[in-house]
Design a protein with these regions (language model features):
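Extracellular and select intracellular beta-sandwich modules with Ser/Thr-enriched
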Residues: 314, 329-331, 346, 384-389
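Short, surface-exposed loop/turn segments at beta-strand-coil junctions that are enriched for proline
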Residues: 306, 351-359
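Short, aromatic- and glycine-rich surface loops/edge beta-strands on solvent-exposed regions
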Residues: 359-380
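Short beta-strand elements
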Residues: 375-408
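Substrate-binding clefts and catalytic carboxylate motifs of secreted carbohydrate-active enzymes
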Residues: 62, 92-96, 106-107, 113-116, ...
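Active-site mouth of glycoside hydrolases
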Residues: 1-138, 243
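Extracellular Ig-like/FN3 beta-sandwich strand-entry sites
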Residues: 296, 313, 345, 358-362
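Aromatic sugar-binding surface patches on proteins
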Residues: 340-350
């Protein structure tokens, strides 16, 4: 499904979507907050939108009011980070998203009701880009921007565990990248670049040349998207029903949020998303960024299947290794059983004891099974293989973040 985000686009797009069978989530051109004087104008906008594109069979859902209370998180401000004024600003933004107000409580109810009357054949999402209602039944595609405007991509599972309804259908997933080139130290400077986010997560000054920085922005985009998608897939139907990536194509040659650049060439993130969205994936909890010798990790292993038939006699293998590990240190674990269709299944837990070595540590997962005709194609039996790899780095215990933090605190007290 492709979402036409906050606007109505050219007729050729809808004609091509009809021809190819592409499904569309069509937003109304209603973005941001409005005063109480616009009720009649909003109804006119809805009526015209239905008249102009409502006859296209590719449109399967209407989106009503986009970000009625503004973005929950603005661009990071390193000069204000952690200050009481910045925390107060975040609290005020959250209050606008969850407490009753004109846009949320009245205008959006009108949009949902009237749009449903104008086009009763399609479902309507009255508002999007807001937090779920406190204690209410409404869900939303909350735009959290983890790993780009706040927090990190590793916060995704923790945030969803604390407020599960945020995982219902999250949006605001992604990061900007810079096109390959000899970028100066002042980059990024193109018109739509979110410079503050680059400075926080992938600063140009941290790289010796522009080409390395541009490649790092693409690697970071892959990491953020993969972390979100894998976490969401592990929560299938409990409560997640899907997700929406920020953009498919960059709006300008210099860069953007897209999985494709402005010339429609695939970025590395395009392949990352393709792999993360395959019909069957094998998943593990994220490894820490660094580990130390002797540390023990327990990681749950899940298999998420989009197939409509079960995978019988499935075998999941887990191998923990490093580039220079002797054979006796390589750790292996296996699981066997049936993987139900259209479900996420926890197959077991892998316990890793970090050996007394330093350097890369990798967890390789592989699932192998067969599915009868009807699952993937027209043959009688199909082999299903899913693989995944997670990486961390083993560092000496004295260099662990906890130890370094403790040293800094002790120096501060002395």
């Amino acid at each position: 499904m492709v979402r036409v985000f906050g606007h109505i686009t050219r007729p050729e797009f809808y004609e091509e979507a009809d021809r190819t069978g592409m499904l569309l989530w069509q937003d109304l051109p209603l973005v941001g907050g409005y005063s109480s004087k616009v009720r009649r104008a909003v109804k006119t906008t809805m009526r015209e939108a239905v008249d102009v594109v409502g006859h296209h069979p590719s449109i399967v859902i209407w989106g009503g009011h986009l970000s009625p209370n503004g973005e929950l998180f603005g661009l990071p401000d390193p000069d204000r980070s952690g200050l009481p004024s910045e925390r107060n600003r975040t609290v005020r933004r959250m209050a606008r998203h969850v407490l009753p107000n004109w846009n949320r409580s009245i205008l959006d109810s009108i949009i949902g009701r009237e749009l449903g009357k104008m086009d009763p054949a399609r479902p309507v999402v009255a508002r999007s880009g807001v937090l779920p209602s406190v204690g209410g039944p409404h869900r939303s595609d909350s735009h959290l921007w983890l790993g780009w405007r706040t927090g990190t991509a590793r916060d995704v599972s923790r945030v969803f565990a604390r407020w599960p309804r945020l995982a219902s259908f999250p949006g605001g997933i992604g990061t900007q990248t810079a096109a390959t080139g000899s970028w100066p130290l002042t980059a990024p400077e193109w018109s739509t670049a979110e410079r503050a986010s680059f400075e926080r997560y992938v600063p140009r000054r941290a790289y010796g040349d522009g080409e390395s920085w541009a490649a790092a922005t693409e690697t970071y985009q892959c990491e953020v998207l993969r972390s979100h998608i894998e976490t969401i897939r592990a929560l299938r139907y409990r409560p997640s029903g899907g997700f929406c990536i920020t953009a498919l194509v960059d709006p300008e040659p210099a860069g953007g949020f897209g999985l494709l650049d402005a010339r429609r060439r695939a970025k590395p993130a395009y392949h990352t998303v393709t792999d993360a969205c395959r019909p069957v994936v094998v998943l593990a909890q994220r490894l820490p960024l660094t580990v130390v010798p002797g540390q023990v990790l327990s990681l749950d292993i899940h298999v998420d299947s989009d197939l409509r038939r079960s995978l019988d006699d499935a075998v999941v293998s887990a191998v923990v290794s490093g580039p220079d590990w002797p054979p006796e240190l390589i750790q292996r674990r296996g699981f066997r059983g049936t993987i139900p269709g259209d479900e996420t299944t926890m197959v077991g837990t892998v316990t890793i004891t970090v050996p007394d070595l330093t350097g890369p540590l990798e967890l390789d997962l592989e699932l192998e099974s067969h599915v009868a005709d009807g699952g993937l194609g027209a043959d009688d039996l199909h082999r299903v293989v899913a693989t995944n790899r997670y990486r961390t780095v083993v560092i000496p215990a004295a260099e662990s973040l906890t130890e370094l933090t403790g040293q800094a605190r002790r120096r501060g007290r002395s």
